[in-house]
Amino acid sequence: MSSARGLVLVRMGRGHHFGALLAVPAAGRTWDLAVSHYDGSDLPDGAIVEWHQRCLGGKWDGIWQFFSAYPEALAAYDFYWLVDDDIEADPATVNALFDYVRTHGFELAQPALTTDSYYSHRITLACPGFRHRHTNLVEIMVPILARDTLHRVLPIIQQTRSGFGLDWLWQRFVTHPCKQIAIIDALPVRHARPLRQTLRPAIEAQGTTPEEERARLVCAHGLSRLHGVAIAGVTDSGRTIQGRLRMALALAITYWRQRKQIDKRPWGVEQTGLLMYRQLFAPLGFSKNGK
């Protein structure tokens, strides 16, 4: 373990897209790297890691097992990037991500996704013109958690393999959610594989499905479906845009201009209208009553 204040923890297997981050000398990064294998694959030759583990199964049960095996890691870092192995990023971007969340005091954040990424939530796609947007949603594939937030979330992580439903819940554990949750547009990464194809079979082999796990979280914590909403944003010029209506207009215009670059799922009039509707009316989910 080094003096780095950030930890990148990746659940990794065959066919990963993580090679650019595996052989970075410690002197070239401000973070430590932990690799937790979810299958029988091995570290490639030349990999430089501070932590290594093998735990067959899903993403989040592996993360729980990692911190159970290495409890000292829970106190060693200020921020934790719990990232999927099909995320493509370069070392400079990861260095900058940790610097960005530290500088802005975020407790829960994620990098935006490039427009050629496979994506679940439209709001997670990079929005040109913004440095970052304050949102109610950080998805489970690329979250960055502050240490205290991770400690609050860990008991919930113990209950899930897939993580389905975590992104409907963990914003409740942030101290000031309107200010400390963000999608960072200035530092996008690429999600390279189609959604939900890699770990689902391993989870189903253990007698459950991601949807069943989410249903249990919904029941246990009084959750409802959460749609991503941007409540404020900081532009490239440093100007702050406040309010759901103003952000709805800014996002609709910007994403419309980018629609031809969003090539994994179509973006047209219907998607733009749905984005604006949710921006204006969807509950934020910061508390049990949905606010």
In which residue ranges do the predicted regions lie?
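Short, well-formed alpha-helical segments that are part of the catalytic scaffolds
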Residues: 1, 5-28, 41-43
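Active-site-proximal specificity loops/subdomain of glycosyltransferases
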Residues: 21, 29-78
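Short glycine/serine/threonine-enriched helix-capping/active-site loop
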Residues: 36, 109-114, 184-185, 191-192
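Short, hinge-like loop/turn segments at secondary-structure boundaries
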Residues: 51-53, 125-129, 199-202
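Short beta-strand-to-loop acidic/aromatic patch adjacent to the donor-nucleotide binding site
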Residues: 75-88
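Conserved catalytic core of nucleotide-sugar-dependent glycosyltransferases
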Residues: 90-176
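C-terminal catalytic/acceptor-binding lobe
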Residues: 160, 164, 168-291
